[in-house]
Amino acid sequence: MDNHGILESLLFTAGDEGLDEKQLLEILDMSKNQLVELIENYSSHGLMIQRFGTTYVLTTKKEAATYIEQLIEQKSQMKLSQAAMEVLSIIAYNQPLSRSDIELIRSINSDGAVKTLIAKGLVEAKVVNEQRSQQLITTDLFLNVFGISNIEDLPTTEEDDEEMDAFFSNLVNQKGENND
């Protein structure tokens, strides 16, 4: 990997805090002039390196601002009601299952919550094994939102309570003000 790639990786890992010039010079084993030249020659399609005092930060280019604002708006719309969170967890742990299966588990009509989850792209309805009713399953977006690679990565009852609490607090953080 070249120095541009290493610098980009370091700044990406450091996140919003960035890295102090001294740290970069030490890690990259180069002079200040070499670092300045490296940054001046840095080019990425959507990223740039900015200096704030003696700290360097990997940031997005200003031209991407409107697209980033759209993404942030979409993410803010991902908030879920308590009912939708409950239905989502039922589907995640028991998939595939039908709407009637969810109603049996919850003892209440869940159509509103299911429609919300489908509309937000967290759940999809599919015909599984030629069954008469559509079966609900989680999507790749669900995996992405909850930071897991596959459904088997969901916490199980055998795992630490802390891990379960962390997963469900992530769900609670998605809670919106609307009730389904």
Curated annotation (Swiss-Prot):
Keyword Mitochondrion listed: no
NCBIfam families: SMC-Scp complex subunit ScpB
Gene that encodes it: scpB
Example of a GO biological process term: cell division
Keywords assigned: Cell cycle, Cell division, Chromosome partition, Cytoplasm
Entry GO CC: cytoplasm
Cited function: Participates in chromosomal partition during cell division. May act via the formation of a condensin-like complex containing Smc and ScpA that pull DNA away from mid-cell into both cell halves.
UniProt-listed InterPro entries: ScpB_csome_segregation (IPR005234), WH-like_DNA-bd_sf (IPR036388), WH_DNA-bd_sf (IPR036390)
Name of the featured protein: Segregation and condensation protein B
Subcellular location: Cytoplasm
HAMAP family: ScpB
Subunit: Homodimer. Homodimerization may be required to stabilize the binding of ScpA to the Smc head domains. Component of a cohesin-like complex composed of ScpA, ScpB and the Smc homodimer, in which ScpA and ScpB bind to the head domain of Smc. The presence of the three proteins is required for the association of the complex with DNA.
Disulphide linkage map: none
Family from the record: Belongs to the ScpB family.
Coiled coil: none
